């Protein structure tokens, strides 16, 4: 009996002690209290400014926030001032969430008072998730805010400043900085962008049947440089006036083909196949005037300088891109003209010095002049190969170079004498011709060498980019970015450095490993369409290749832009600083 009494006493005591456990019920805030929402309209009616006050312990999903105008299919992109946090969610896995207040911007045209905007968002707390919440806002009912939210710009990291941005940003601190472009041009003269101009200048000065004197050589070189400077000056004026990137236009396939035909014609004329001259009737009228001049080739030197400027400018380098960006941002015609003129003048000074000092050590004129003239004909033929390789399929580049090199070595061997040192050079030239002809043999006989099969049958890179067509699609894609950063690659089929990025940099295993944590986007700029131009104007893109990086708020990371080719190691280190 005592045991039975003790048993019931313990049972009732346990129920009494734990009665509060069954009576207690966990309560959650209402959705409007957990995520207090408000919205205003900017004074220019281009921004709908949204604000969420998030209660402690609650969070909003970044990818669940959306907005659209009622009756229109295009969603509005969101740009937030706060960074999202990574959160391990029991329902969705690893997601990006906001745990504090949010200030966001929806861009659009909110001019019609009767238009309505639907804003949808969803949040959770520990142990409980709210269904998606939708707010329908009438534009005419929104309060107009005098304070316009400015999109957040990530602070500049000097370790990440590209050469282009350093140049463009630093130039605004000094009115005299434009004269630094003269020094910049001196260095740029020794880059691959300008090297093709040296043979052209030499062909004009020493490729004559008569040996030019010092004054004539200087005059021809000076006019050549002034022609080149005029091209760059006009380029600076155009960029300053309308801000459009003319490098893209100059790299259009039609322009490349036209320049190639021009240089082939010039090369053939140097081989003696024909003579390029004015019609006889016009030439006779100009004979009297030309006889008064030191030579009739001065106009040709000036014109060739202009052409050389066009050939060099499509080769986008970081200094030239920075100069154009500086000019575009200044919007001043005088600054644009002087900046590019000084750049071209600096590039031309080494050419003039080389011409003058080279001319002094030349031997007396003779048959060797025809050999030199024909040699420069081959140099001119190299320019069409270089230009056409940008627009032809990749397999054609080695074939064109092989054909040109083979013909050159055979021709060079035939120029050598059969005695002594000349005979040795002849044998070496024929041997080199046998080596350079191999790509042509592979093509003709369809033998699959390792190099050819690698180019034609194997993918260059396993990297998969999401293709973007316009700015609207870019904004939508960035808003849904599941990674910490996004990369936008501006690519074109005619861009040599773009192909080098794909073949040499993006294919690197270390770079591909880093790409797993980056949203990879790509825009084809091949056709230079209106959508392409809109993207270039929005991001001040001056040429290709250009690679942009964006943060979690869909803003370009200041100083992270890459212009010009970068090898795998350098590019990997660049990305490492961003991740």
From Swiss-Prot:
Keywords: Cell inner membrane, Cell membrane, Cytochrome c-type biogenesis, Disulfide bond, Electron transport, Membrane, NAD, Oxidoreductase, Redox-active center, Signal, Transmembrane, Transmembrane helix, Transport. GO terms for molecular function: electron transfer activity; protein-disulfide reductase [NAD(P)H] activity; protein-disulfide reductase activity. GO terms for cellular component: plasma membrane. Its main location: membrane. It is an enzyme of class 1 (oxidoreductase). Pfam families: DsbD_N (PF11412), DsbD_TM (PF02683), Thioredoxin_2 (PF13098). One of its GO terms (biological process) is cytochrome complex assembly. Its EC number is 1.8.1.8. The keyword Oxidoreductase applies. The keyword Oxidoreductase applies. Residues 199-229, 275-295, 358-367, 418-419 are cytoplasmic. Residues 449-579 form the Thioredoxin domain. Residues 17-177, 251-253, 317-336, 389-396, 441-579 are periplasmic. It is found in: Cell inner membrane. The chain crosses the membrane at residues 178-198, 230-250, 254-274, 296-316, 337-357, 368-388, 397-417, 420-440. It is a multi-pass membrane protein. Residues 1-16 form the signal peptide. InterPro entries: Cyt_c_assmbl_TM_dom (IPR003834), DsbD_gamma (IPR035671), DsbDN (IPR028250), DsbDN_sf (IPR036929), Thiol_diS_interchange_DbsD (IPR022910), Thioredoxin-like_fold (IPR012336), Thioredoxin-like_sf (IPR036249), Thioredoxin_CS (IPR017937). It catalyses: [protein]-dithiol + NAD(+) = [protein]-disulfide + NADH + H(+); [protein]-dithiol + NADP(+) = [protein]-disulfide + NADPH + H(+). Gene3D superfamilies: Glutaredoxin, Thiol:disulfide interchange protein DsbD, N-terminal domain. Disulfide bonds join 124-129, 193-315, 495-498. It comes from the Bacteria. Belongs to the thioredoxin family. DsbD subfamily. Required to facilitate the formation of correct disulfide bonds in some periplasmic proteins and for the assembly of the periplasmic c-type cytochromes. Acts by transferring electrons from cytoplasmic thioredoxin to the periplasm. This transfer involves a cascade of disulfide bond formation and reduction steps. HAMAP family: DbsD. This is Thiol:disulfide interchange protein DsbD. It comes from Haemophilus influenzae (strain ATCC 51907 / DSM 11121 / KW20 / Rd). The lineage of its organism: Bacteria, Pseudomonadati, Pseudomonadota, Gammaproteobacteria, Pasteurellales.
């Amino acid at each position: 009996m005592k045991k039975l009494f003790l048993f019931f006493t313990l049972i009732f005591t346990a129920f009494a002690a734990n009665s509060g456990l069954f009576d207690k019920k966990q309560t959650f805030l209402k959705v409007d209290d957990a995520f207090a929402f408000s919205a205003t309209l900017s004074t220019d009616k281009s921004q709908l400014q949204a604000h969420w006050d998030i209660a402690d312990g609650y969070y909003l999903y970044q990818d669940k926030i959306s907005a659209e105008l009622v009756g229109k299919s295009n969603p509005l992109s969101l740009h937030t001032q706060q960074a999202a946090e990574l959160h391990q969610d029991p329902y969705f896995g690893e997601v990006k969430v906001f745990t504090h207040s949010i200030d966001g911007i929806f861009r659009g045209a909110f001019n019609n008072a009767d238009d309505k905007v639907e804003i949808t968002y969803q949040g959770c707390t520990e142990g409980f998730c709210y269904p998606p919440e939708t707010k329908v806002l009438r534009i005419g009912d929104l309060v107009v805010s005098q304070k316009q939210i400015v999109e957040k710009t990530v602070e500049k990291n000097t370790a990440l400043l590209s050469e282009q941005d350093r140049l463009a940003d630093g130039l605004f601190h000094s009115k005299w900085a434009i004269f630094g472009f003269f020094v910049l041009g001196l260095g740029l003269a020794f880059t691959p962008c300008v090297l093709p101009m040296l043979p052209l200048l030499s062909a004009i000065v020493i490729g004559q049947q008569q040996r030019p004197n010092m004054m004539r050589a200087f005059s021809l070189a000076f006019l050549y440089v002034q022609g080149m400077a005029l091209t760059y000056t006009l380029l600076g004026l155009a960029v300053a006036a309308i801000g459009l990137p003319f490098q893209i236009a100059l790299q259009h396939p039609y322009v490349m083909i036209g320049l190639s035909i021009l240089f082939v014609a010039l090369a053939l004329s140097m081989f003696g196949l024909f003579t390029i001259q004015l019609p006889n009737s016009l030439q006779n009228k100009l004979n009297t005037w030309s006889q008064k001049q030191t030579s009739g080739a001065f106009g040709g030197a000036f014109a060739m300088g202009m052409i050389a400027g066009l050939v060099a400018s499509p080769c986008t380098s970081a200094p030239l891109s920075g100069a154009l960006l500086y000019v575009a941002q200044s919007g001043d015609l005088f600054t644009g003209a002087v900046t590019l003129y000084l750049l071209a003048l600096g590039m031309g000074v080494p050419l003039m010095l080389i011409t003058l000092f080279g001319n002094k050590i030349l031997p007396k004129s003779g048959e060797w002049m025809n050999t030199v003239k024909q040699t420069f004909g081959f140099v001119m033929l190299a320019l069409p190969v270089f230009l056409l390789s940008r627009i032809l399929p990749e397999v054609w580049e080695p074939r064109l170079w092989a054909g040109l090199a083979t013909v050159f070595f055979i021709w060079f061997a035939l120029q050598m004498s059969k005695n002594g040192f000349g005979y040795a050079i002849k044998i070496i030239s024929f041997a080199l011709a046998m080596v350079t002809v191999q790509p042509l043999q592979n093509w003709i006989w369809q033998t699959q060498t390792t190099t050819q099969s690698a180019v034609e049958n194997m993918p260059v890179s396993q990297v998969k980019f999401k293709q973007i067509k316009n700015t609207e699609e870019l904004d939508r894609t960035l808003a849904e970015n599941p990674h910490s950063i996004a990369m936008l690659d501006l690519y074109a089929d005619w861009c040599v450095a773009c192909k080098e990025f794909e073949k040499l940099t993006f294919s690197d295993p270390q770079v591909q490993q880093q790409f797993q944590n980056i949203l990879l986007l790509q825009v084809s700029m091949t056709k230079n369409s209106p959508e392409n131009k809109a993207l270039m104007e929005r991001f001040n893109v001056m040429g290709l290749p250009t690679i942009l990086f964006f943060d979690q708020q869909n803003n370009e990371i200041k100083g992270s832009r890459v212009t010009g080719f970068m090898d795998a190691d350098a590019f990997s280190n660049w990305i490492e600083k961003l991740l």
